[in-house]
């Protein structure tokens, strides 16, 4: 962990607010593009194993079939959110085409074969 980040964590840990912070509920939405091994955006339809993009509360699409949104249920802990995201992400990876990967961002970036 970076020194500045550690200092910030220490600085803002105010015991007066601990009960309030514990009552927070949180969720994560993570976008990823399905990308083929050649670095181009996948043109294949939304994988059936991921359920309907319109009704699955955890895996949906954004502006295109290839842009997945992974959505965690609400959790009271950061660890709970991250574990749910990990579970959804792993399930998604197991159920997309073999030659597809999940691009880490929603910005499309075709890659050349030399990359």
Regions found by a protein language model. Give the residues of each.
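Terminal catalytic/cofactor-binding subdomain
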Residues: 1-115
